[in-house]
Amino acid sequence: AKAILPLVERTRKLGCKLGLYNHGGWGGEPANLVAVCKYLREHHKAKHVGIVYNLHHGHGHIADFKQSLKLMQPYLHCLNLNGMNEGAQPKILQLGRGKHEANMIATIRKSGYTGPIGILDHRSDTDTEIALRENLEGLKKVLELQVDK
């Protein structure tokens, strides 16, 4: 946490939020992201520091996503969705084509989270407009199946 203090100060002065990104390793683990946010908020008046959580970097937390989300929720700046299969097979997958994102999205909806939700395009083999449309169509299908649940 101390290593990013200059960035914490700079973003505070600019009036910007600072989002910690779960890009794998120790720093991408939900408990560690939360610990860094707590430390910065408690010891450096950094209420603007939070978490940008990307499902495509969260394959290791499919099974405990409900607990991870609950832990991170007070600090979330944004949640980015992705199709989800075990073992990141594949890592980037359109919404509605994975085995687990429907349950994860249902968990998000039931959690009371009301912050921003994003859809990213990390597919270099597909035009961004096409990739985003596919994700929006997949999200629509997932949500339609959850209407009465």
Protein language model annotation of sequence segments:
Residues 1-3:
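Substrate-binding cleft of extracellular glycoside hydrolase catalytic domains
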Residues 6-9, 13-15, 30-149:
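Histidine-acidic metal/acid-base catalytic patches
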Residues 25-26:
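Acceptor-substrate binding/catalytic loop of class I
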